[in-house]
């Protein structure tokens, strides 16, 4: 949830379209930014920030998940407090009672879901996984590379598993769904529910709407990459997978 800015827009899109999506909960996990592991609390805080901006904190729960890889955790799966147990147990509990096939929409690495299938394989017929990931036919995709062992395990099960691919540089993947900061600055200010009490953004500042926070995320993204020439547009990988 705390990676760059497409995660936040995917979550907001889901929560804004309640006529189409019945969002019951979210799980988060850590990723690596290429240098070091990210902080699970920062992912949780950013997810909660978006939920609050969309005024859904009373109906959507967030659960902390894995901080390691599937391979590193799997042997501890029978321990009551294994790494990621809160998120994994939530997935299992919801899948067990779902009257229809429960859709899991991971827009990051697959660790939490793979652990849930390992711990309770009986939920496999009850779920449908729609994952934003893979750069097939080519290698090198962030969500896949963050935990290839989780992907491998899921592929070896009989889970209903769909991939929404990135396909860098191609028109046939989510990399083609791009937006410029100029478009964001024109369209997004004030969009979404308006909060009476503003919240603090991850880069500082206070915000009463997701639209204003969206502008801030893009402005900080532009600042972060200014030495590389500030890319004119940014793919919204995760939001494209949701849509």
Where are these regions (language model features)?
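N-terminal acidic, glycine/proline-rich low-complexity segments
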Residues: 1-243
């Amino acid at each position: 949830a705390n990676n760059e800015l497409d995660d936040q827009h995917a979550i907001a899109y889901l929560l804004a379209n309640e006529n189409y999506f019945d969002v019951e909960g979210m799980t988060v996990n850590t990723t690596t930014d290429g240098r070091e592991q990210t902080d699970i609390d920062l992912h949780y805080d950013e997810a909660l920030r978006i939920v609050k901006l969309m005024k859904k904190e009373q109906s959507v729960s967030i659960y902390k998940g894995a901080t390691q890889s599937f391979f590193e955790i799997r042997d501890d799966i029978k321990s009551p407090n294994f790494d990621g147990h809160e998120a994994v147990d939530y997935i299992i509990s919801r899948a067990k009672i779902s009257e229809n096939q429960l859709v899991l929409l991971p827009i990051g690495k697959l660790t939490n879901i793979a652990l849930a299938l390992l711990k309770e394989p009986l939920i496999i017929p009850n779920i449908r996984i729609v994952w934003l990931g893979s750069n097939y036919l080519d290698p090198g995709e962030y969500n896949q590379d963050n935990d290839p062992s989780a992907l491998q395990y899921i592929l070896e099960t009989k889970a209903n598993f769909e991939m929404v691919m990135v396909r860098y540089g191609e028109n046939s993947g989510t990399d083609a769904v791009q937006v410029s900061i100029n478009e964001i600055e024109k369209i997004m200010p004030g969009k979404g529910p308006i909060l009476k009490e503003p919240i603090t953004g991850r880069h500082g500042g206070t915000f009463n709407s997701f639209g204003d926070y969206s502008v801030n995320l893009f402005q900080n993204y532009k600042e972060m990459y200014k030495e590389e020439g500030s890319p004119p547009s940014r793919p919204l990988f995760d939001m494209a997978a949701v849509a």
